[in-house]
Regions:
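N-terminal amphipathic/basic leader segments beginning at the initiator methionine
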Residues: 1-22
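Alpha/beta enzyme core
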Residues: 2-3, 14, 26-32, 38-324
Length: 324
């Protein structure tokens, strides 16, 4: 039937009707809240490039994690800022490293909150690349796998509930899965940054995490933003290697791929609403150009509607508050 028998506006007439037929629902339980943890005592340092986001000492990270949990957010994602860096990135697998210490403290204080640890070497290497760099300036994929596996085991022993490798080395999921299993950590899930693009939207994060490469860029290992079939292939390869959850990063410029990957795979799918996406909203809202609450909730709903089961977002606490 067509108009006038069919009138879609009938089901839009009231708030109750719109809620009754709503196809996509947004809940705090969908969110993961990223946090930047740093050494220091009673340190809470605002990140200018990411309004509303701070570098947190461990005590403040525990407090922030508790606030997230109280809002119904089930998980936090930890990024560490080490006190020192070296060529290998050895601070990543230090048993007393910043992520390991923060994980233990958060789990001790909030045992029901899931702690996800980002696994990459870029925050720990003096050159800012995500792996071992050869004398020719190339990231050595296979040499890096051993260090990633070592870091994964250290993070899991440190209290991480889920390991999230973001380095984009070939074979990293299989290497990490094997290392965890050998250490008696077969129950530790892997959430892989499977389709991680070489994106311009990471700018604020690289300042926040002090992880910009000292030379070159990451296009030789992160994905070309023009490629969709490759993103699906990367996810399927990671699943074959043992990934329990796959991820698309960034989210907003890649909603088509969130949908494709959701349709073509059978594991939970995460999407990362990244720093550049976040900061654009915060700056525009501060200037009075947009309604922050409305735009954030519309954005997160769009990511969920595209097919994401899990949304990693710096807006998590605000969005959870608005959804109460």
């Amino acid at each position: 039937m067509a108009f006038p028998q069919t009138r879609p506006r009938r089901l839009r007439a009231t708030h109750a009707l719109r809620g009754l037929v709503r196809e996509t629902h947004l809940s705090p339980s969908d969110f993961v809240y990223p946090m930047f943890v740093a050494h220091g005592v009673d340190c809470r340092k605002p990140i200018a490039e990411m309004p509303g986001v701070d570098h947190l000492s461990i005590a403040h990270a525990v407090e922030e994690a508790g606030e997230a949990a109280a809002l119904g957010i089930p998980a936090v994602l930890l990024f560490g800022l080490p006190a020192t860096k070296d060529e290998e990135g050895s601070g990543a697998w230090d048993e007393e490293g910043i992520v390991q210490l923060a994980s233990r403290a958060i789990k001790d204080a909030h045992p029901d909150l899931l702690v996800i640890t980002d696994l990459c070497l870029c925050e720990y290497t003096s050159h800012g690349h995500c792996g071992v760099v050869t004398p020719e300036g190339v990231v050595d994929n296979d040499a890096t796998l051993e260090l990633l596996a070592r870091t994964a085991v250290s993070q899991a022993h440190g209290g991480a509930d889920i390991i999230a490798p973001s380095d984009m080395m070939d074979g990293r999921v299989g290497a990490i899965r094997a290392a965890l299993d050998e250490e008696g950590l077969a129950g530790t899930p892997i959430m892989s940054y499977s389709a991680k693009f070489a994106s311009a939207f990471y700018g604020p994060f690289r300042v926040a995490a002090d992880s910009a490469p000292a030379f070159g860029d990451r296009r030789a290992y992160q994905m070309d933003p023009a490629n969709g079939n490759e993103a699906v292939r990367e996810c399927k390869l990671d699943i074959d290697e043992g990934a329990d959850i796959v991820m698309v990063k960034p989210a907003l410029a890649y909603l088509d791929l969130i949908r494709r990957i959701k349709d073509e795979t059978e594991v939970p799918l995460a999407a990362y609403n990244v720093s550049g996406e976040y900061s654009m909203v915060k700056v525009a809202a501060a200037a009075g150009y947009i309604d922050e609450r409305a735009v954030v909730l519309e954005t997160l709903t769009g990511i969920r509607r595209a097919g994401a089961d899990i949304v990693i977002t710096y807006h998590a606490k605000d969005a959870a508050t608005w959804l109460q």
